[in-house]
Regions:
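Substrate-binding pocket helix/loop in short-chain dehydrogenase/reductase
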Residues: 97-98, 105-110, 218
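Active-site helix of classical SDR
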Residues: 121, 157, 165
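Alpha-helical segment proximal to the catalytic Tyr-Lys
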Residues: 126, 170-171, 246
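Residue(s) in the substrate-gating loop at a strand-loop-helix junction
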Residues: 141
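Short C-terminal tail/terminal secondary-structure segment
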Residues: 146, 237-238, 244, 249-264
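Short, small/polar-rich loop/turn modules that mediate ligand/substrate recognition or access, typified
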Residues: 173, 178, 248-250
């Protein structure tokens, strides 16, 4: 299927690993001009080189910036003033008991996971409306619907992203601009894979055994019964970014492996 993304300018934040990297690679495969972002120039170079190696026709540029700050967001907008597609993917997570989540933790998670997308959307959405075409996607999580007790601060930010995406979509009424959120389920990103591997080692079991036990005990509602691969999420995001997805607007698109049981 041709997703009609040839020549579209796309910024994927937090691009150097996991879901963000997979999205950037998929958009590059579809012919989009992709802007790669991370906090350090070294990681941007590494990600760009890897995508170029895997996608022969990739058209990439990199912008290192810390999007957890207003200054970092301003830097990106200054270096890339025009976008067709904005994928707000950058994010952090950390399992932590509620009693031990400090004020600084709450503020950091909100700054990185929520305000990065707010600031960039505020910068790019007006011009998208003026040109009567654009795509903004927030990479939220099933944790935004089913708040994990072990990561309440993380779940809060994912719920906020869903709300912001819906609210921004309401402002695009009658235009060809769409704003959506995509809700991955448990995904085998590098960070999650390392986390799972460490826990499996601590519990003296294989990674495969731990994965089985994880879905049995921690995510029993999963229909998929395995970790989702980053490229599977990227496939969904690429379609949502496509002109073919013009009827999808204000939606919380689930790619959660069936973890969320509710229909609505």
């Amino acid at each position: 299927m041709n997703l009609e993304l040839e020549g579209k300018i796309a910024l994927v934040t937090g691009t150097t690993a996991g879901i963000g990297f997979a999205i950037a690679r998929r958009l590059a495969c579809e012919g989009a001009d992709v802007i790669v972002n991370s906090r350090t120039e070294e990681r941007v170079r590494e990600a760009t080189a890897k995508i170029n190696k895997e996608v022969s026709k990739a058209n990439l540029r990199g912008i290192p910036a810390d999007l957890g700050t207003a200054e970092g967001c301003e830097q990106v907008v200054g270096e890339a003033p025009r976008l067709d597609i904005l994928v707000n993917n950058v994010g952090i997570f950390e399992p932590k008991p509620f009693e031990k989540i400090t004020d600084a933790d709450w503020e950091k998670f909100f700054a990185v996971n929520v305000m990065s997308g707010v600031r960039l959307s505020r910068a790019y959405l007006p011009a998208m409306k003026q040109r009567n075409w654009g795509r903004i996607v927030f990479i939220s999580s099933e944790s935004g619907l089913q708040i994990p007790a072990e990561m309440i601060h993380y779940g809060m930010t994912k719920t906020a992203q869903i709300a912001i995406a819906r609210g921004l979509a309401e402002t695009c009424e009658g235009t060809n601009v769409t704003v959506n959120s995509v809700l991955p389920g448990p995904t085998a990103s590098e960070g999650v894979t390392e986390f799972v591997s460490n826990l499996a080692t601590q519990q003296k079991m294989s990674a495969a055994k731990f994965e089985k036990e994880f879905f049995k005990n921690a995510r029993p509602s999963s229909i998929l019964k395995r970790f989702i691969e980053p490229h599977e999420i990227a496939n969904v995001v690429a379609f949502v970014c496509s002109p073919l997805a013009s009827a999808i607007n204000g939606a919380a698109v689930r790619a959660d492996g069936g973890v969320v049981r509710s229909i609505g």
